[in-house]
Amino acid sequence: MDVEKFVENAIKEIRERVKDGKAIIALSGGVDSSVCTVLAHKALGDRLIPVFVDTGLMREGEPEKIKEIFGNMGLVFIDAKEEFFKALKGVTDPEEKRKVIGELFVRIFERVAEEHNAEYLIQGTIYPDIIESQGGIKSHHNVGGFPTSYKFKDVIEPLRELYKDEVREVARYLGLPKEISERMPFPGPGLAVRIVGEVTPEKVEIVRKANKIVEEELADYDKWQCFAALIGKATGVKGDVRVWGYIIAVRAVESRDGMTADPIKIDYDRLRRIALRITGEIDKVSRVVYDITPKPPATIEYE
């Protein structure tokens, strides 16, 4: 890929489609939305309004990190935790979850756009998002989960033809910090799709803590992605007392573009340490398993 040519064309496309108007951009802090934000900022300057929505479904410390990196671009920070938990109450179907989240994201963006007199939405959709949504594998919140009715004049997706490894190339070319350019993929719906079943504040806090432990313990492994997911409940024993606790699945894979993936081989002692830390540091977890399923037949994320 000719990265320089891509950047030049992406900036040109954004300018041509937004013209003299204003645009808001959905910023999550991931490499896709971060690259999109830098490209759009180069194209529009202060006519771009970056919006970060704190859904309550982010990893530990993520909202604070976003403020630190993008605060100088006029970042609009929206605390929508209560809205998201209310909207997800009672929802157990993964497709419905993604649609609920996609719908709420867009309605929040519409509110911000109205306040700033912006008519365009820019988002960091990449090619695998489109393939999986169109193929019926899973609806990505910014594609299949995107509502059919919205108030924007146009939705612009400059990265729609790129794979993740190509987006990383662009990030490096643009000089984004390594913590962004090499950041592990994180789903747009956040920790909601790392919880099988209904999403509750308690489950989110558990999976957030478990995710942090997994990332810490596997920091020295070469991987595409690693994370923890809450997948159900099982009987356990803590302090000679029976407990009915949560099951945490650990997932760690290698991949080039996310379309296929293989589980990485983790040293047994490391896996045991992860299990002991998660069950020891998180009261309501009774069991930890390591998922060794490749993609296909599994997807990388659980929902």
Swiss-Prot record:
Main EC class the enzyme belongs to: ligase
Gene3D superfamilies tied to this protein: 3.30.300.10, HUPs
Biochemical pathway: Purine metabolism; GMP biosynthesis; GMP from XMP (L-Gln route): step 1/1
GO molecular function, a single term: GMP synthase activity
Keyword DNA repair among UniProt keywords: no
Described purpose of this protein according to its UniProt entry: Catalyzes the synthesis of GMP from XMP.
PANTHER family from the UniProt entry: GMP SYNTHASE [GLUTAMINE-HYDROLYZING], GMP SYNTHASE-RELATED
Name under which the protein is recorded: GMP synthase [glutamine-hydrolyzing] subunit B
Organism: Archaeoglobus fulgidus (strain ATCC 49558 / DSM 4304 / JCM 9628 / NBRC 100126 / VC-16)
